[in-house]
Each structure stands twice: as C-alpha cells, then as structure tokens.
C-alpha cells in the first residue's frame, strides 16, 4: 500500500540519487514479504528457507520490524560468519549485513554488542523514517570501491532530535544517527554493534569472496597443480591477486605505490604427512592493513586448499 513501510524504504533507497554527490542508483533490490504478525523465529526460519534458493544478496534491511525481531535478526546475521570448523565441514559462507533502525535507546544490549554483522540506526521518528534504506542507497553504488559510511548526506531523512549528552551517549552506545553539526547534515560513525566499522566489515567480505572466486577459477582452468613448491606458489598467487584487487578498490592501504600486505607462502617441506596424504596445502597466512576512512586496522586470514598431486 501507499503507506507501507516497505514502499517507504524502497522509495528512500532509490531517492538518494537526488543527493548531489551520490555516485549512482542502486541497480538491484529484492523484497521478501512476511505476514505482519510473524514471530521472530518465523522470520529467521523464513530467511533460512529463502537462502536455500536465493542466497546472492548481502544487505538485510527490515522494514517495520519490532525490536524483538531486530534482536533475532542480529543473532541470525551474526551466525552467517562461519567458523573455521564450519568451513572445513563443507558449509558455504554467505555473509549478510543487517542494517535496522529503532526509536528505542536500550536496544543495543551487551549481548548485541557481541554480535557481528549488525548495524543499528536510531531516530526518534523511526516509525516514519527509513534511514537504513536511504543509507544503503547512498553508499552501495560506490562498490566495489570502498568508502567510509560516515559523513554521508541523505535525502529525505530528518536529523535526530537528540542533543548534547543524550546524543553522545547514543553514539558511544554504537547507535548510528543522522545528525546536524555546523550547518551540515550527515550520518554518524558508520559502526557495527561489535565496534567494527561498516566499511571494514564489507571490505573483509569482498576480499574473502574475491579470493574464493579466483581460487575456483585457478583450479578449474588449470589441468593440474602439483603438490610441490611450484604448486603452492601458484595458489599463493591467487591470494596475492585478490589482495591486489583489494588495494585497487581502496580496501587495503597503499604506501609508496605498493599494497600494505604480507603473504607467507609455505613450502612442500612444511606439509605434514597427513596434509600430503589428503593433498591439503599447509595454511597460506596473509596479513593486510585496511585503509579505512578518516575515522589502521589489520585483517588476517588463512587459505587452506586441497590439491591433486603432480603424479596423478
């Protein structure tokens, strides 16, 4: 209907093209509807079912969700970041980033601060505003180039009416708000409930996805990668190429024309008997310095790959 939160959110998402320095319009959006009286469990169960057939999305923007449902969605989104044990068991990772809004100043609890992949926006008129949709509509068209989520002017969003210490308390509590200072309106910190910045979270995901895609392409397009020093170096080249992509996209810092990252390439002699028997490369360790915005953060990772031996 014309007054539905879903329609209002969609309109705010696409309206950001009206902001002078918006880089473009969001090109693809999907709307997933549930009954207005759905419980928190029914909502997360429905998302699990959706992912079985449609898992090629990243931002989760609930329209008209209650605080109870937002809390459940936070736990659900946090669980989309898999542990090493889950990955080694064969589970496929597809992270989701929850960006929700509330008018409740006590929504971000200690428990929610332990959750990953959660961004909470506060506005006194949250029932009639769509900050998450507007914010995504303003920033997402920049990608794959990384940008800070702070300082973004939004179209059609009222500034918070919180002032002084009340506003500072909310900011310190990891709420994001549309604020006004020195005659300019803009979004505040761009921070997740666990203290990570949004651009850092998305940048890590971009690196992981690029690395995985490049790895699959390398394995499919190469007739045989030997279980030897040359084979290990070829796989390490995938890591380096993915990190170079991240440098080009402004995710990883560049100094003196080079990306600020380090990759440790294992040798065949480093492999244990069990790793060799199972054709699994010893972990390729890498470390990179995230560029971030004017607000260094280091990210690390491990790539483990199973190869076919050279003589098979």
Predicted regions and their residues:
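Surface-exposed assembly/interface segments
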Residues: 1-312
């Amino acid at each position: 209907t014309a007054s539905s939160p879903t329609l209002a959110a969609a309109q705010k998402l696409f309206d950001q093209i009206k902001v002078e320095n918006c880089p473009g319009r969001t090109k693809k959006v999907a709307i997933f509807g549930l009954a207005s009286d759905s419980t928190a469990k029914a909502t997360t169960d429905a998302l699990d079912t959706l992912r079985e057939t449609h898992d090629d999305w990243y931002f989760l923007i609930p329209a008209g969700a209650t605080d109870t449902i937002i809390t459940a969605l936070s736990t659900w989104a946090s669980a989309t970041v898999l542990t090493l044990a889950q990955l080694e068991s064969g589970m496929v990772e597809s992270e989701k980033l929850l960006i929700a809004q509330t008018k409740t100043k006590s929504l971000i609890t200690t428990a929610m601060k332990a959750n990953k992949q959660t961004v909470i926006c506060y506005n006194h008129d949250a029932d009639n505003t769509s900050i998450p949709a507007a914010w995504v509509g303003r920033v997402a068209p920049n990608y794959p180039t990384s940008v800070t989520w702070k300082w973004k002017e939004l179209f059609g969003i009222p500034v918070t009416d919180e002032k002084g210490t009340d506003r500072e308390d909310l900011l310190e509590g990891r709420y994001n708000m549309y604020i006004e200072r020195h005659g300019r309106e803009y979004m505040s910190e761009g921070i997740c409930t666990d203290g990570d910045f949004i651009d850092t979270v998305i940048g890590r995901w971009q690196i992981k996805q690029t690395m995985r895609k490049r790895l699959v392409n390398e394995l499919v397009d190469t007739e045989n990668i030997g279980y030897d020093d040359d084979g290990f170096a070829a796989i390490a080249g995938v890591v380096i190429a993915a990190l170079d992509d991240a440098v080009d996209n402004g995710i990883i810092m560049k100094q003196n024309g080079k990306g600020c990252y380090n990759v440790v390439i294992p040798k065949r002699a480093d492999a244990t008997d069990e790793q060799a028997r199972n054709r699994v490369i010893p972990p390729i360790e890498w470390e990179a310095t995230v560029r971030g915005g004017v607000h260094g953060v280091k990210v690390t990772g491990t790539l483990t790959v199973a190869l076919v031996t050279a003589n098979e």
